[in-house]
Amino acid sequence: MEATLENGFAKVAAGDWLMGRAQPAACLGSATTKGLKGFIVPDRACVRAVTCAGDAWCGAADRPFLTRLDALPDVPLVLVSAKLLVAPFGARAGARCVKLVPFSFNRATPVTEFKLGWAVAGTKSRVTRVALEDGATLTVRPESMVAWTGKDPTGFCPKLSVLDILLPRGPRTLAWNFHGPCVVWFEGTQEESVRPRGWRR
């Protein structure tokens, strides 16, 4: 199947196969519709197949990796990939964004969790999913990756750059505090809730 390139991206119909060559580097791509943008972090592997109700986008010949999945509301979305990490940082107007921060590239395989059309790929069955109610707090010491919806976490979680995604420079003692309402996906250790700094009864 040959896809037609439009503005540097190949638009592929639902159910078609997408293939890409290995390229262990991050690629900053932007979709040409709806103003969505995201960091694409391939992990030395190929996109195997994409099935969705909408359209799937993959890069040009020199950037052959998937850049975004746009699914219709309440429609199942399936991503089949050997190793792929996607870190979106843009969201639809009036919607929450799913953010994924990879700390390791050596064990990535898909996890079937999707929110607002974005694919969250993780590590086999080691990813834990926690839904926090309003006012609840979750402290995580991540080993490999963290994804979340809602507010940004507090604690030792500085603003990330491309170099942080490619070459993680943070210590192993990262402790991130997530505050509900939100949903958190993570690989690592879940600790007892910690009161935010300056919190009083």
What feature does the model see in each segment?
Residues 1-201:
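Phosphate/adenylate-binding glycine loop and adjacent helical scaffold
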